[in-house]
Amino acid sequence: MGLAGHTLSKKISLPPGDPAPYRVGERPVTGRRRRRLDGPEKVTGRAVYTHDARKAGMLHARIVRSPHAHAKIVSIDVSRAEKMPGVVIENPGKKVVRYHGEAVVALAAPTRAAAEDAMRAVKVTYDVLPHTVSLAAARKEGATLVFEKSVEEKRTAGDEPGAAAALPQKGNVRGPKPSGKGDVEKGFAEAEGTLEIVTTTSVQTHTCMETHSMFAEWVGDTLEVQASTQGTFSVRDELAEVFKLSKDKVIVRAEFTGGGFGSKFGARDYGVFTAKLAKKAGRPVLMALERKEDQLSSGNRPDSWNRVKLGYRKDGTVTAADYESFGTAGVATGTGTAGFVKAAYGFPAVRAAESDVFTHLGPGCAMRAPGHPQGCFAVETALEELASRLGMDPLALRLKNDPSEVRRAEWEIGAKEFGWSRRAEITKANEAAAASGSPLRRGIGCAASLWYTFVAPGSQVLVRIHRDGTVEVENGVQDIGGGVRTPIAMVVAEEMGLPVESLRVKIGDSRFPFGPASGGSVTIGSLIPAVRAAAVHARERLVGVAAKVLGAAESDVRIAGGVFSAKGQRADFRKVCARIPGDTLVATGDRAKDYDGADTRLFGVQFAEVVVDVETGVVVVKKVVAVHDCGQPVWKTGVESQIRGGILQGISYALFEERIVDERSGRVMNPDVEFYKVLGSKDTPEIVPILVDFYPGKNNA
């Protein structure tokens, strides 16, 4: 286990029924690049997303939303809408709205146009109240309150594990939440200097390709839904709780989801509305949010105000860090950004205080490493300022404070691939450009990243082998675009000696064995060990059948290329399967607990090259080199795609995306993708993902 070239060996006791881990170099199928299995379905339009759901007699649902940031609801008159043909209405009787776009009334009609007519027929009378929509204004004493009572923290599968924190609340500020390590006062006393900076980051909306949506139908007393979700089973569980049903009475399907970065856990309000409308109407109902309401109500990455104070020695060693953050997730919680400062580098002493600030804006939620981009920006900016103050190479400063053996190797690999040694040349070229009157300057920089290894307990996989040789793999996990079918098939193909394309991977159905939600980078690490266990158990049982066909001992049977062999005798896969007793051979695999292995925090480093027009402020990213430790990749193409996607979202966040709020009205002015700009293909730089060879030594995969 450990970094290639620096590995350690250790004896372990395997969990009961769990296969032994792969040995180094014994993976003929996994750990490689290959085309994704669902690609043809997607590019030909055969993949069915929730937006595509259609059924005879189906109704189309819409939500009447508040045009105000803060108001009392005086009355809701649905009488005209109720008289329209085929219209059903769900009126929860809301008394107060706290953000522009908050749901007030849901309805469904035979066509989308009819639903829009019904929306216009609903008359809501508001008593508009004062609002506060900026982080700075909401923090002030005497600011308009968003909530009169204390708010409890709510967590989803996209958040870091841990209990919700009970924190003090004064005005609109909830917190601070204190945390840290070491003796901060001692660290500052030992410092030869201090540096303090403040950074701010803006809101980033999820802007999933497929907006949030749900299709619901009641079949007797069973609720069947198709959902655009990151959690097949979390949707099932929430709907079962709302409607007081046993879990087997809620069936959730999620074979294809058009993107999810933390906002698609659970049924959400639109999903509950959809199911209630379907129950009232006795007909299937589709709710597909429009882009505007999706941007307003479905969640976002909170903004942040971060203060970083570093104590340092003149050789660049950081002796202590004092960190304070405020952020607004609108009417929600969870804006903390201190995870990075506490864990990314080897600062010996850290004191952190994180506070949520409520505003009259749509709720924030988990989004791709919650809190880390904001915290990373703050800490890395402070390190850059410190390097400048000390006249020190920024990379050398980071190496001075980075005790991670893995990331030190990544810094070295990345610097070489990127050409970090060009710094002096670039400085001279910029001086020449300035002398010639050119506004263009070239710059390079580097920064670290960090995430954690989380495992969802209870994941189970079923492998079913039919007598005609068909092999099916079943798990209820959803695919949010990462292509999870492909690594599942690769693992089973490796154990069974079959072509990857020959396997049928069936996912996204809550009637299948339990699978993890897709959040916090938990999916593959939770699922693949269970896949391998199921595949090994199925192979062992099939070897028993093959031994009888070949007239050999089970210990002599080998399988490769779809052929069983033993002492000169051969039988192809289908011939052996035809001798399976009964109709099918079924084997299951469970995700066993991790054994004690290497440090499996996920370390990474990025190097970037940009061109800046110093007159206009336009920044063009030319190249990014990203070096990452992802353990042992099952499917390299998929891992590299995830790295590329994260880089593109990061560039988009930094340079393109900006939610614009009118402070006078409290309304979001650009809830769209025309004026809320996201990075496009013409803005995409050269991206070089590099995976370091690391052996976690914690499970069978």
PLM region spans:
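Generic long, charged, amphipathic alpha-helical segments
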Residues: 501-507, 677-700
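Cytochrome P450 core scaffold surrounding the K-helix E-X-X-R motif
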Residues: 631-635
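Structural alpha/beta core scaffold segments of enzyme domains
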Residues: 1-627, 684-686
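Conserved phosphate/anionic-ligand binding catalytic regions in large, soluble enzymes, centered on
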Residues: 261, 265, 375, 484, ...
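Generic N-terminal targeting/processing segments that precede catalytic cores or assembly contacts
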Residues: 65, 92-94, 620, 629, ...
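Active-site "cap" helix and flanking loop/linker of ATP-utilizing ligase/carboxylase catalytic domains
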Residues: 637, 641-675
